[in-house]
Amino acid sequence: NIPDNLKLTVLTNSYSIAHVCSLKEQIRVIILGGDLLKDSMTTVGEVAAAQAAAYHPDLCFMGVYAIHPEYGMTIPYPEEVSIKRQLIRSSSRVIALVNPAKLNTVSRYQVCGIEDFTTLITDGHVPQEMASRYKNRGLDFL
């Protein structure tokens, strides 16, 4: 839930996130252009990446398909690599939002190393031993 009085600017390539944020009066929404992936309703490609390069977000919340302490963040779709890399490169801090089932998994295309994240947030129970593998790599684990 987003508090009604939260004032911020959201830069996104996701139409779903843009819609949710647009319902809050205090949130300014900037949508990146590019090629539309209809399955996820996100924009991707070089146009989106070039637009993202014009911004320097304080904080980037990155949804994660697969993450591993050794192999970093990986995704199954090559079209998403450039926009994700650019958002990570441009941001001061990057927080990974991870379903516990995605921990210690690897997909086809590497986006970044684990060291590119400052924090990992998960929405479920994670065994202490698994969490330690990420903490030992320097991540805050919430």
Label every PLM stretch briefly:
Residues 5-10, 117-119:
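Short active-site oxyanion
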Residues 13:
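Active-site catalytic microenvironments in core metabolic enzymes, especially phosphate/sugar-handling
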Residues 16-142:
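Conserved phosphate- and dinucleotide-binding cores of soluble alpha/beta proteins
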Residues 1-6, 21-25:
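Active-site catalytic pocket residues across diverse enzymes, especially alpha/beta-hydrolases
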